[in-house]
Amino acid sequence: MNSITKEKAGQGHTELAADNASYIEALYEQYLTDPDSVDTDWQAYFEQYKSSNDAQHNAIKDQFLLLARNQTANKSSNESTGTSSSNSDNCTDPKQMGVQQLISAYRRRGHRRAKLDPLNLHPRAEVEDLTLAYHNLSEADLDTVFPTNDLVIGKDEAPLREIIEIMERVYCRHIGIEYMHVTTSTEKRWMEEYVESNLGYIKFDKEKRLSILERLTAAEGLEKYLARKYTGVKRFGLEGGESFIPAVNEIIQRAGGYGTKEMVIGMAHRGRLNVLVNILGKNPADLFDEFDGKVQPEKGSGDVKYHNGFSSNVMTPGGEAHLALAFNPSHLEIVAPVLQGSVRARQVRRNDQPSLDNTGGNSVLPIVIHGDAAFAGQGVVQETFQMSQTRAYTTGGTVHIVINNQVGFTTSRQEDVRSTEYCTDVAKWYMHQSYT
């Protein structure tokens, strides 16, 4: 991500000149966050100053500043004798440093500008560090060509205007991507390369687009039919979240293609009837009979239709896979740890227990669907996360989906719902990636 090529780590190089001190500090901070994001030569250089486990970062930064000050005399001497540095002009160009910092800001904070609220109920404040002025740039620089460094766009340099257009397209459209808090460098770099190389778009062929349209139409059609035929009957519809159905279907098909044999789904009320029909294949006639009161329980007093579980088998590219939708109690989120226990038991039964080194457990996949207010507000969510990386309870990873219809039970004002910007911020404690 640095504009300076580090050919040698010595005291006689102009990259350590005083006017680069702030750049080196920023580069070192970047190295501390993600070592793989800087050139390999810089990695080796920084490693010299942090080889001891007791090394203090402030001391290392002070060492860089000392080196920079020591270079001032050399720089003045070169100017007086007419000699020049071996590095190109942009090595010491503060504009280039500003461009790189702007790219990093988009990766860190571009999600703050993403268009996530179709109802426009919560206007978003201007993100200061995504402005040109914050990085000592101006509109006069827009047509200047700069090196793109590690920006994955297929070219080594581009005008600043084009760089900004690409970053806006990747990070600030209708999908917010927040991943810079992830501590695993390979995971972070994979996400960076994937979204930037695709310019923020997932490319589907015609067949896939038709399949998605079919799923969306089925999801929307069911909700409209139930609303019209059973007006006023409680059903916890999926209106506004219909894209959830093709998303879950894609997860199931992809997982099956990778060899997963069972998928266990846990969810609350909203969208449950749609999942029963359009994901697990429950006969719609059976659902309508439940609405009409024609179904009598064999034992006990029965339960409401949006608590019922179901299981079925579906075909995937990897063969037949078993789906199970767990029965749901009315207490929000309590199904999550129950689901994890069910998945772990199924993995043990298949002799496929996962370990903490990310091996095993691939035969059974847990999928948990949350509501936005419950995900942020129910303590059992954090408790389940806390157990997710322990030897006895890990399931090897869970797909979490949050359906946010912007109404948390009886509270619609975000300031009264939670203390964080996103309902998924609680997952940051466990270094999960977030896509909104």
Model-derived segments and spans:
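Hydrophobic alpha-helical scaffolding
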Residues: 14-17, 32, 89-92, 153-157, ...
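Active-site pocket-lining segments that scaffold enzyme catalytic pockets across diverse folds
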Residues: 225-285
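Extended, charge-enriched "interface" segments that sit outside catalytic cores
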Residues: 4, 12, 49-244, 260
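Amphipathic alpha-helical packing elements
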Residues: 99-122, 251, 255-275, 366-369, ...
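Short, hydrophobic/amphipathic alpha-helical packing segments
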Residues: 99-100, 164, 244-252, 335, ...
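Cofactor-binding active-site loop characterized by glycine-rich and histidine/acidic residues
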Residues: 261-436
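Subset of Sec-pathway N-terminal targeting signals
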Residues: 6-49, 55-56
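A glycine-rich phosphate-binding loop feature that marks nucleotide/adenosyl-phosphate handling sites
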Residues: 45-48, 119-124, 184, 267-275, ...
